Amino acid sequence: MDNEQLQKLTEDISLQDFGKPFRHRAFFNDRLKTTGGRYMLSSHNIELNRKYLIEHGRSELVGIIKHELCHYHLHLEGKGYKHRDKDFRDLLQKVGAPRFCTPLQTKKTQKKTYMYRCAACGQQYIKKRAMNPERYACGKCRGKIKRIF
């Protein structure tokens, strides 16, 4: 699905479920990492995360679009458009939009760890940050520290 198809889908959902036209832009923003989508208050555009379409399919994307359209229409009407507002929660329930989207299943990359060992006594040190072993000595025996990996 490209941005033109997404725009058409958003306009169709807006007319069918809300009975109001969507007059702004809806597009994929590949920089979104943890959120399904966002409604931009200043421009009234809707940005959506393409990863949700890939991982969870079209039905999840439709739910996210409905959620963002709730923000959109309520904001333009001057009603409560925030998650905590009663108007927003009522409209979510009316159109069958989810309050939160399903979490993504993509694995987060593990942070690199550095392992050091004392040459004299064999004491191991695991660090999250690299260090210069020339500047440090073993805390147990004062021996030289060598980097393993």
Swiss-Prot record:
One cellular component term from this protein's GO annotations in UniProt: cytoplasm
Cystine pairs: none
Binding site for Zn(2+): 67, 71
InterPro entries: SprT-like_domain, SprT_Zn_ribbon, Uncharacterised_SprT-like
Co-factor note (free text): Binds 1 zinc ion.
Required co-factors: Zn(2+)
Main localisation: cytoplasm
UniProt superkingdom: Bacteria
Domain annotation SprT-like: ranges: 6-147
Recorded GO MF terms: zinc ion binding
Location(s), subcellular: Cytoplasm
Keywords on record: Cytoplasm, Metal-binding, Zinc
Gene Ontology biological-process annotations: response to stress
Catalytic machinery residues: 68
Family statement: Belongs to the SprT family.
Alphabetized NCBIfam families for the sequence: PRK04351.1
Stated name of the protein: Protein SprT-like
Source organism (scientific name): Bacillus velezensis (strain DSM 23117 / BGSC 10A6 / LMG 26770 / FZB42)
